[in-house]
Amino acid sequence: MLSFLSSNLSNTRQSIAQVLNFALVLSTAFMLWKGLSVVTASSSPIVVVLSGSMEPAFQRGDLLFLWNRSPRAEVGEIVVYNVKGKDIPIVHRVVRTFPEVEGKKEKTVKEVTVSTPTPPNMLLTKGDNNLADDTELYARGQEFLHRKEDIVGSVRGYMPMVGYVTIMLSEHPWLKSVLLGIMGLMVILQRE
């Protein structure tokens, strides 16, 4: 009777240890992601290129590293932005910048002096592989992007083809289920 209790207690302890190890891995990954978000000032410091609109600069499946601490974006800079109402990051190049416009209906432009802080800039973007600019991609009635509101970050580095795994998982939902099942079995069957 005593041996039965000790074996059950041992199995229970081992199961709890496995669950805690799994929770530790998840929480560590979450903390690393949030820490990277704070350092880069970007809600999504790493993104995957989902289309071929930036070829030849970036291919579909490239993993991009973003930085969002610059107050302005310049012409030629590659930025990642989200369209209002949609949560799909778009990677395109800035082709034009505008000064902040006050009273658009009156067509007056705010005068910028040396003592005035740099106004937030507005951007027009375009994919390198696209024929037209992105005004058709922006939200209805939006003619440009606001640097602070719409930009997720500027591209500072990339790793080719590493993000293709993410694309495969989103295009083939059954593959995601298979991988999660295999990972779950590995956690359950792991013995220390």
Curated annotation (Swiss-Prot):
Q: How does it sit in the membrane?
A: Single-pass type II membrane protein
Q: Give the annotated active site.
A: 53, 92, 134
Q: Report TM segments.
A: 19-39
User: Catalyzes what?
Assistant: Cleavage of hydrophobic, N-terminal signal or leader sequences from secreted and periplasmic proteins
- Please state the protein's primary subcellular location: endoplasmic reticulum
GO BP terms: namely: protein targeting to ER; signal peptide processing
Q: Which GO terms describe its cellular component?
A: signal peptidase complex
Instruction: Give the residue ranges for region: C-terminal short (CTS) helix.
Output: 178-189
What ranges are annotated Lumenal (topological domains)? 40-192
GO MF terms here are:
peptidase activity; serine-type endopeptidase activity
Those parts of the protein on the Cytoplasmic side are 1-18
Disulphide-bonded residues: none
Q: What class of enzyme is it?
A: hydrolase
Q: Which InterPro entries does the UniProt entry name for this protein?
A: LexA/Signal_pep-like_sf, Pept_S26A_signal_pept_1_Ser-AS, Peptidase_S26, Peptidase_S26B
Key words, A-Z = Endoplasmic reticulum, Hydrolase, Membrane, Protease, Signal-anchor, Transmembrane, Transmembrane helix
Its quaternary structure?
A: Component of the signal peptidase complex (SPC) composed of a catalytic subunit SEC11 and three accessory subunits SPC1, SPC2 and SPC3. The complex induces a local thinning of the ER membrane which is used to measure the length of the signal peptide (SP) h-region of protein substrates. This ensures the selectivity of the complex towards h-regions shorter than 18-20 amino acids. SPC associates with the translocon complex.
What does this gene product do? Answer: Catalytic component of the signal peptidase complex (SPC) which catalyzes the cleavage of N-terminal signal sequences from nascent proteins as they are translocated into the lumen of the endoplasmic reticulum. Specifically cleaves N-terminal signal peptides that contain a hydrophobic alpha-helix (h-region) shorter than 18-20 amino acids.
Its family remark reads: Belongs to the peptidase S26B family.
What the entry lists under NCBIfam families is as follows: sigpep_I_arch
Question: Domain notes, please?
Answer: The C-terminal short (CTS) helix is essential for catalytic activity. It may be accommodated as a transmembrane helix in the thinned membrane environment of the complex, similarly to the signal peptide in the complex substrates.
Name of the protein described by the UniProt record? Signal peptidase complex catalytic subunit sec11
**Which source organism?**
Emericella nidulans (strain FGSC A4 / ATCC 38163 / CBS 112.46 / NRRL 194 / M139) (Aspergillus nidulans)
Q: Which gene encodes it?
A: sec11
